[in-house]
Amino acid sequence: YRQGFDVYSFDHRGQGLSDRLLSDSDMGHVYDFTDYIDDMDIVVKKHDLSEYQQCFIIAHSMGGAIATRYLQTHPEHPVTGLILSAPMFGINLPWYLSPIAIPVTQIMSAVSTLPRYAPGHQAYFPKPFEDNPLSQSYGRYQWFRNLYTEKPELQVGGPSTRW
């Protein structure tokens, strides 16, 4: 604010401090990816952005995929720029799992009406620094770990088969 910027931020459903959709609050889940896009449209429309000369979206990881898809599907958007940090434009799988990942999750979803963790995923489990794939900075990782310890409602484990 003091630098002349107005910042609007939100946690998309099932992440951060937003409501979880399942009784297993660790499971990353959404009924349909377009729900994320619809939520973003609601947030953008809630704020009168017409007074701004420029409007940027800064998005990280899955937020990058959501922001990109929002801009693609809402040509009337007020956004003049998009800044993406490690956008999730695909799921990083070993080469031998890529061809079977979608059929396996479709079968799992058809067999059970209840969402289950996607293969290879589980409830939230804090990895030691040496085994974490997200940060090479011990200080940053400890800050992140401390935040999750102080605010366990932020923790999210693996995604569901329906995610």
Predicted regions mapped to residue ranges:
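Alpha/beta-hydrolase active-site loop
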Residues: G28-D48
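Alpha/beta-hydrolase-fold enzymes
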Residues: M62, I66-P159
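Alpha/beta-hydrolase fold nucleophile elbow
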Residues: L49-S61
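Localized chelating/binding microdomains
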Residues: D6, S25-H29, F56, A67-H74
